[in-house]
Curated annotation (Swiss-Prot):
This is 3-hydroxyacyl-[acyl-carrier-protein] dehydratase FabZ. GO terms for molecular function: (3R)-hydroxyacyl-[acyl-carrier-protein] dehydratase activity. Transmembrane segments: none annotated. InterPro entries: FabA_FabZ, FabZ, HotDog_dom_sf. The active site is at 47. It is an enzyme of class 4 (lyase). Gene3D superfamilies: Hotdog Thioesterase. Keywords: Cytoplasm, Lipid A biosynthesis, Lipid biosynthesis, Lipid metabolism, Lyase. Its main location: cytoplasm. One of its GO terms (biological process) is fatty acid biosynthetic process.
Length: 150
């Protein structure tokens, strides 16, 4: 799945769209996504000047976005009408730093899959080595229901 299809599914945009490509998807079971970590990411202006490290929370967000694609595709939710929102994170661990130039591979496996609440085990890797892992919980919500009324 290329970036155009990803942008049709996810409401995220620059600078927080953190998925560049979906390499594999097995609806209802698992997904593998890719994030190219560029030195041009705005976060590196402050994290950290002179020794840029990709923040752990960005790795978790990238995992969540990949998991959101799996939820939307697996549950046959209407594209452009739903967003997947965080419901919880358990057992998050950061094993190694992620640097500009790294290619982050994001692997998620379904533990339970429901519109109201899904749970997935996520692993992030660089060069085949685990850099982070977590269990993520998320819920699918209609965009019209989560937009703040001004």
């Amino acid at each position: 799945m290329d970036i155009q299809e990803i942008m049709e599914i996810l409401p995220h945009r620059y600078p927080i769209l953190l998925v560049d490509k979906i390499l594999e998807i097995e609806e209802g079971k698992r997904i593998i996504g890719l994030k190219n970590v560029s030195v041009n990411e705005p976060v590196f202006q402050g994290h950290f000047p002179g020794f840029p490290l990709f923040p752990g929370v960005y790795i978790l967000e990238a995992m969540a976005q990949v998991g959101g694609i799996l939820m939307i595709k697996s549950l046959n939710l209407e594209i452009g009408k739903y967003a997947v929102v965080f419901a919880g994170i358990d057992d998050a661990r950061f094993k190694k730093p992620v640097y500009p130039g790294d290619q982050l591979i994001l692997e998620l496996e379904v533990i339970s899959l429901k519109k109201a609440l899904s749970k997935m085990k996520g692993v992030a890797k660089v060069d085949g080595e685990v850099v982070a892992q977590a269990t993520l919980m998320a819920a699918a919500r209609k965009l019209e229901d989560i937009k703040r009324n001004a």
